[in-house]
Structure formats: structure tokens, C-alpha cells
Amino acid sequence: MEPLLSFKSVSKQYDDMQILDKIDIDIESGYFYTLLGPSGCGKTTILKLIAGFEEADNGDIIYQGKSINHLSANKRKVNTVFQDYALFPHLNVYDNIAFGLKLKKLAKSEIKRKVHEALKLVKLEGYESRTIEGISGGQKQRIAIARAIVNEPEILLLDESLSALDLKLRTEMQYELREIQSRLGITFIFVTHDQEEALALSDYIFVMKDGKIQQFGTPIDIYDEPVNRFVADFIGESNIVEGKMVKDYLVNIYGQDFECVDMGIPEQKKVEIVIRPEDISLIDAKSGLFEVTVDSMLFRGVHYEINCIDRKGYEWMIHSTKKAEVGSKVGLYFDPEAIHIMVPGETEEEFDKRIESYEEQDNA
């Protein structure tokens, strides 16, 4: 099946700064995608290229099988929800949503029907005559979405569009966005630097750094099997330690062998090991895989964040529902499945092949 939208080796430069470096992406119809990465990684530039606000320096942007490199923004079946919403303060809610429809010179009855449907979808029926100054931040967000979807775009772009909301409202809007996307069935492409937001909202995530795609996959794939240290650090909390692959299903960490589920990596190959804090249990010091000293503890609401130091001076973070006394000796335990092996220098393609070989082995 042909992708709805593709970037083929797309590059973009501002002055002497390389913003996008030979980007390749495929976007299928009807899914929620997120471009995730730190400030300056190029994610908003991708949105601008899709919307037609910028042109690529090199490469091709393909929409439904045709190049749209030089297609003007107003001819693209794309709408954008901006970070500041970009609502017209001198127009009421109805006229804000109807603005694009009036430019198309639709009949008044058709405009009224479409505006009503859009307001119903974002759960703001009856707000037609409200002023923009008289509604809350969350309501402005919904009006901006209604104004975008009323034009029936194939793709909806959202540029950091939840960042101005407080935590509670942002969480509520995450549910709203997922529901709206599911009901409309159109493609959403969302930009954020917030990894929790990306994990909660997305069908698929592109993790970006320095103008390049570091990893693409489902939230679970990226969280459970990060391709490199950057992705492991950026997506959630991680314990990352160095080690060597002894043989298939056995890795050495700090001179001690541990069972794992990885295979196909050369013996004695230097690797990096990721163990998530929630996958580690605190037990009696003598019963653990190794002993650590509790260095600090913070209460995070649903769990305690406990930092420990092992005998070699390395720090370990554990998320536990149990308290631990600072200064006490405890044991750490984790299952072989909790160990995720990363091979330094491994490309995403090589990484994907390795992970696929595990699945083939499991199904054999």
C-alpha cells in the first residue's frame, strides 16, 4: 500500500546550519504520528515543509504518489494547529471556525452545518457567539482544532499545541485529541519535546536528534527496545551501563554474568545495557543479584524514586512502591527480560533486523 505522505532524502539548511539531513519518512493514512525530540532537532521544520510554509533544499516530498515540493500551502489538503492557536481576537468563536469556509465561498447554510458539526466534535456546542478573550486556554485549543478540521484536511498538523496548558488540562486534552483523531479517522502529525505526551498519544513515533531520525516505531517498541543511548535517555528514565556480550543470552556487566534474551551479537562485543527503573526490585541485600547502598529517595506520588550506589560507584535508579532507608544496604533484582542490549554504532536498519530475528526465533 502506497504511503499517504513520504519524505525522500529531504534536507533543509538555514544559513550554514543543517536543520534536516537526508530525512526519509513514510506516513500512512489514519494514524496518529508524533515527531519527538529536543529543541532545534528539526521537528517543526518537517511540519513547515508538509504544510508548504517552507521548501526543501534537496529531496522530494511525495503526497499520494506525486511530488508537492513546489505546491503552494493553500492547495495542500493540510491544516495546522499552532502553538499559540493563532485565533482571531476580533472574531467570535463561530466566525473563527467559519473563516476558511467563507474564503471558499460556501453557502451560509453549509457553513453553519459544518461549524456546528466541528463544535459538536470538540464538545463546545453553544459557544458560537463567545469572544476569544472570554474562553479558557483549553477551550481556545479546541476552537483551534475545530477551525482546522472544519476544512476536512487529509492531514492535521499540531505544533507543540498542548505546551501552553497546565498539567491537568494538558492531560485532559490528550484524551480529547486521541478521541477526535479516532472519530475523524484522518492522519494527525504532532510535534512535541515531551516524551510522556508522545507515548500517551501516538500510534507511531519518530525520535529526532540533530536533524536526523534516530528511531521510528510504536511507543512500546521505542520504550522497550531503544536503538541507542540517546533514545533510551530521552524516552523515560533509564539505567544505562556498559558490558560485554559473553555469548547468546548471556551478558557480562561489571565482571558479573547475567542471563538476557538477546542473541546474534558477536562474543566479547562491547555493548550498552538498558534497564528501566520500574523493572528493578529492591530485596534483601544477600538475595539480590548484587548489593547497593541507598543514596537518596523521593516520593513521586505513584512510586518512590530511589537512587542507589553499587560497590563500583555506579548509580542505579529504582521506581518502587516500597520505601528504603537512606544509607541502608539492599539487593537489586531484575529478570532477564528486563535487560535490553544496545550495540554502539548499530544503525536502525541493523537494529530492526536483529529484533526481527528474535521474533523469528520465538515463532520457530
UniProtKB/Swiss-Prot annotation:
It is an enzyme of class 7 (translocase). Its main location: membrane. Residues 5-235 form the ABC transporter domain. It is a peripheral membrane protein. It catalyses: ATP + H2O + polyamine-[polyamine-binding protein]Side 1 = ADP + phosphate + polyamineSide 2 + [polyamine-binding protein]Side 1. SUPFAM superfamilies: MOP-like, P-loop containing nucleoside triphosphate hydrolases. One of its GO terms (molecular function) is ATP binding. Its EC number is 7.6.2.11. Gene3D superfamilies: 2.40.50.100, P-loop containing nucleotide triphosphate hydrolases. It comes from the Bacteria. PROSITE patterns: ABC_TRANSPORTER_1, ABC_TRANSPORTER_2, POTA. Keywords: ATP-binding, Cell membrane, Membrane, Nucleotide-binding, Translocase, Transport. Pfam families: ABC_tran, TOBE_2. It is found in: Cell membrane. GO terms for cellular component: ATP-binding cassette (ABC) transporter complex. ATP binds at residues 37-44. PANTHER family: SPERMIDINE/PUTRESCINE IMPORT ATP-BINDING PROTEIN POTA, SPERMIDINE_PUTRESCINE IMPORT ATP-BINDING PROTEIN POTA. The complex is composed of two ATP-binding proteins (PotA), two transmembrane proteins (PotB and PotC) and a solute-binding protein (PotD). Part of the ABC transporter complex PotABCD involved in spermidine/putrescine import. Responsible for energy coupling to the transport system. Belongs to the ABC transporter superfamily. Spermidine/putrescine importer (TC 3.A.1.11.1) family. This is Spermidine/putrescine import ATP-binding protein PotA. It comes from Staphylococcus saprophyticus subsp. saprophyticus (strain ATCC 15305 / DSM 20229 / NCIMB 8711 / NCTC 7292 / S-41).
